[in-house]
C-alpha cells in the first residue's frame, strides 16, 4: 500500500458530505475514487464506498481529515489534477467530480509535438465540440507545421467546418503552440490538394 505524493483536491464541503455518508457504513469504511475506461473518450469517474476488506495491496491511499480515499494504480494517472466538490444550489446539493485527465493521461512538456497537440484536442477542444455532437481527430502534423484534422460526428460535412476550424480550433492550437504550429487543415482539404492533379 503506497501513500500518495499528490492529493486529489476534495473541498471541505465534499469531505463533510463523505464523512456523513461514511458514518452510516460499517466502521473502517473509506471511499474509493476510480476511472472506468480510462484514457478513452468514454472515460467515466466515480466514487464508491471502500470497506476494509476491499482494499487491494496495489491501491494508493490518500489521507484526508476524517477518512482515506483509495485509488487503484491504473486510475491514478488519469485522476491527476482531479477536483471533488459538494455544491449547494437552489434545487439541492450535488457532488461534482472534475477530472481533466480522465480521457487522456497528461503528457510531459517535452513529449513529441503530436502527443501534446493530441492531448489539447482531447481535453480542451473536443469537449467544446461535443456540445454540437462533433469531434476532431488529429491525423498528422506535416513537416511544414500544420496539424491535419479530421472532423467527425456532427461536424462532418457541416458548412460551419471552415468557420469552426479557422476561427476556433486553429486559433486555439496556434496560440498554445506558437513556435511549433503554423496552422490547421481539414483532412479533406489536405487530400484534395494532394490528389487533384491525377
UniProtKB/Swiss-Prot annotation:
Pfam families: Fe-S_biosyn, NifU. Signal peptide: none annotated. InterPro entries: Fe/S_biogenesis_protein_NfuA, FeS_biogenesis, FSCA_dom_sf, HesB-like_dom_sf, NIF_FeS_clus_asmbl_NifU_C. The keyword Iron-sulfur applies. Its cofactor is [4Fe-4S] cluster. GO terms for biological process: iron-sulfur cluster assembly; protein maturation. GO terms for molecular function: 4 iron, 4 sulfur cluster binding; iron ion binding. Keywords: 4Fe-4S, Iron, Iron-sulfur, Metal-binding. [4Fe-4S] cluster binds at residues 155, 158. The keyword DNA repair does not apply. Binds 1 [4Fe-4S] cluster per subunit. The cluster is presumably bound at the interface of two monomers. PANTHER family: FE_S BIOGENESIS PROTEIN NFUA, IRON-SULFUR CLUSTER SCAFFOLD PROTEIN NFU-RELATED. Belongs to the NfuA family. Involved in iron-sulfur cluster biogenesis. Binds a 4Fe-4S cluster, can transfer this cluster to apoproteins, and thereby intervenes in the maturation of Fe/S proteins. Could also act as a scaffold/chaperone for damaged Fe/S proteins. HAMAP family: Fe_S_biogen_NfuA (MF_01637). Homodimer. This is Fe/S biogenesis protein NfuA. It comes from Haemophilus influenzae (strain ATCC 51907 / DSM 11121 / KW20 / Rd). The gene is nfuA.
Amino acid at each position: 500500500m503506497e501513500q500518495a505524493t499528490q492529493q486529489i483536491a476534495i473541498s471541505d464541503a465534499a469531505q463533510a458530505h463523505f464523512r456523513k455518508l461514511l458514518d452510516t457504513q460499517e466502521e473502517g469504511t473509506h471511499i474509493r475514487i476510480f476511472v472506468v475506461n480510462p484514457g478513452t473518450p468514454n472515460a467515466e469517474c466515480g466514487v464508491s464506498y471502500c470497506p476494509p476488506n476491499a482494499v487491494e495491496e496495489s491501491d494508493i491511499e490518500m489521507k484526508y481529515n476524517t477518512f482515506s480515499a483509495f485509488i487503484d494504480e491504473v486510475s491514478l494517472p488519469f485522476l491527476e489534477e482531479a477536483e471533488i466538490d459538494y455544491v449547494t444550489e437552489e434545487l439541492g446539493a450535488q457532488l461534482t467530480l472534475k477530472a481533466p485527465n480522465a480521457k487522456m493521461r497528461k503528457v510531459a512538456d517535452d513529449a513529441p509535438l503530436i502527443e501534446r497537440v493530441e492531448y489539447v484536442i482531447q481535453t480542451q477542444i473536443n469537449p467544446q465540440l461535443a456540445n454540437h455532437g462533433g469531434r476532431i481527430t488529429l491525423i498528422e502534423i506535416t513537416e511544414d507545421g500544420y496539424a491535419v484534422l479530421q472532423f467527425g460526428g456532427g461536424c462532418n460535412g457541416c458548412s460551419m467546418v471552415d468557420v469552426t476550424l479557422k476561427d476556433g480550433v486553429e486559433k486555439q492550437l496556434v496560440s498554445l503552440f506558437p513556435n511549433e504550429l503554423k496552422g490547421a487543415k481539414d483532412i479533406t482539404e489536405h487530400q484534395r490538394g494532394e490528389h487533384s492533379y491525377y
